[in-house]
Swiss-Prot record:
Pathway: Glycan biosynthesis; glycogen biosynthesis
Annotated protein name in UniProt: 1,4-alpha-glucan branching enzyme GlgB
Record's catalysed reaction(s): Transfers a segment of a (1->4)-alpha-D-glucan chain to a primary hydroxy group in a similar glucan chain
Active site location: D409, E462
Coiled-coil parts of chain: none
Keywords: Carbohydrate metabolism, Glycogen biosynthesis, Glycogen metabolism, Glycosyltransferase, Transferase
A family per Pfam: GlgB_N
Family as reported in the entry's similarity comment: Belongs to the glycosyl hydrolase 13 family. GlgB subfamily.
SUPFAM superfamilies: (Trans)glycosidases (SSF51445), E set domains (SSF81296), Glycosyl hydrolase domain (SSF51011)
Highest taxon, organism lineage: Bacteria
Organism whose genome encodes this protein: Gloeobacter violaceus (strain ATCC 29082 / PCC 7421)
Entry keyword annotation includes Glycosyltransferase: yes
EC number: 2.4.1.18
Keyword match 4Fe-4S: no
Amino acid sequence: MNPTVELRDIEALVTNLHADPFAILGPHRAEDGGAWVVRTYQPGASRVVLLGESGELAMENRRHPDLFECAVPTAPGAYRLRVEDAWGERLIEDAYRFRGSLLSDLDGHLFAEGNHHRIYEKLGAHPAVFEGVAGVYFAVWAPSARNVSVLGDFNRWDGRFHQMRRVERSTGIWELFIPELGEGTVYKFEIKNGFGHIYEKSDPYAFQQELRPKSGSVVADLDRYSWNDGEWLKRRALSNPLKQPLAIYEVHLGSWMRVPEEGDRFLSYTELADKLIPYVKDLGFTHIELLPILEHPFDGSWGYQVLGYYAPTSRFGNPTEFMAFVDRCHQSGIGVILDWVPAHFPKDGHGLALFDGTHLYEHADSRQGEHKEWGTLVFNYGRNEVRNFLIANALFWFERYHIDGIRVDAVAAMLYLDYSRHDGEWVANRYGGRENLEAIGFLRQLNELIFLYYPGALSIAEESTAWPLVTRPPYLGGLGFNLKWHMGWMHDTLAYFRTDPLFRRYRHNDITFSITYTFYENFVLALSHDEVVHMKGSIIGKMPGDGWQKFANLRALFTFMYGHPGKKTLFMGMEFAHGREWNAYQSLDWHLLDYPQHRQMQQFVRALNRLYTGQPALYEEDCNPAGFFWVDCHDVLNSVFTFVRRGKDPSEQLLFVCNFTPTYHPHYRVGVLETGFWQEIFNSDSGIYGGSNKGNLGGLWSENWAIHGQPYSLGLQLPPLGCLVFKRRKEQD
């Protein structure tokens, strides 16, 4: 037998410093071109026997105690190894006889330039068949690593057994096919850096992770689920969401409802499908928005500190069960939006931080790479492979889980280099400015690709500053989102409604100001989880007055919200006036529905959603100034606001009259453009909802009395802390 392996290569192998263990292990033709040599590295083995086509051959360990080899006269073909060690005897396939790869030269090229939109099909862990043998193909990007191994129960979490090879044609990808593994296998990567330091890391591209506090990745097959939402996807692709009603129910799955009889455990994805979907459908919401369900280690982050970007959290079940949840949403006519967090990630040792011993996913300079306020790290959007990781991730959720949209969290933190930083704590861009040019480019590319691949999808920005053109396409200089949270409306409106009605006349502009800029962007009016945490209290708790007035104020707020241009988002619990501040560790207080006023509030929101989705004037022209005009916004003393919403058909118009004080006006006159009978189609003060039941007996005939610049008018009864909605009855009706 010719000793064709240099001692330095053996030393590199046994010290986990070899970049290509295939150069030593597996079958090799001898230097003289005659016999073949088979080698295997089996630390701790006392005996190894090769079982091949020509029978059994005992392997020798002459050159190193753990390196076994034998000569065979011809190519060994398919063989197995019988290994004897302190744990007994086992029969295994040799991972190093499989030299195939799922990576092509094109894959490496596209990944290096940041344009591999399905890189998740190549990196990570994938069940595969090589040479007729089933197993799992592993691949990981770690360009600065000296050595990478796969760890798991299958090798007693010993990094010496399954060392990966560095792919020559890539930018630092390591790969290995391990036979006889399959779905459900728990694994990690052991990464040795240039200084010899060893890190155990979860797989950034894993499709499933262990339930915290464990941190292993789990092999999952995403091709097993059979979808039944084809019709929904076809309709979505042909739709324009800006012209459709969007009534979004924002949910934190871990605290919407729990099972107190079983240790207050979470509901599973299957149980949530059984309970949450019918509940949302009954209330008339069109979409569910999920606070981040991407895998995260800390419950208290609500999901906003993500480590497993490609894995739905194991808190509620497995990937297939989450697919079924989305599928059942679609079959019930409900869309699914995911909160997505590309702005930052946590520092947990098993995660992305210092992944290969260097600042791989984050900036090396803490002035660019760390959010001091949040204690998290910032992605390096200027690195192609990092940008590819994030963009492919967003596309992955649309492609593999059929989601309908994403809400991108903390966009402002991405756009500004000096976000939450003092002088000297940030680095200017190449022009000396504070704009993060790489993040801007990333967001534009992200949105262009989402709408290229998934027409009719939603990409919503949570952007809290006055950054221009957030919802305009990149070719016009915009960021490319199609919707943005209306943070200004939320701030001003809540400030107004927190004020005692006696003093609201002094905050009149809080209601009118948002209209001056509401058509500069495509907005979502969001009363979100952010408004009911951190000592802010509940939404009903913000309302002034006695018990009756609190509920009346909240009904008036919601009615005004649904009348104001923009799509709608309500956080869970608001629909029945949840009494206490949201606590992510507890279920909502569902027992409140035993009380009439909370049950009536829920009934009110159900009716409001029916009004909204049934009246095109409330959604068709949300982003067009032609869809709104003030009739009267100057009644400061009475805190009354009157406006009209119009649809694509100008004759489709609704008149809103909102009284934000507890004063009842039995003879209040408002101008209308057209003569005829104006039907009262909604009254927030109806006794059905717990109001005082002041109204107009179903409607009013207009009078030839000009007011508010309109040729006709209505003399109506205006209820206290109430909003009325009128629709002119057409002649043929």
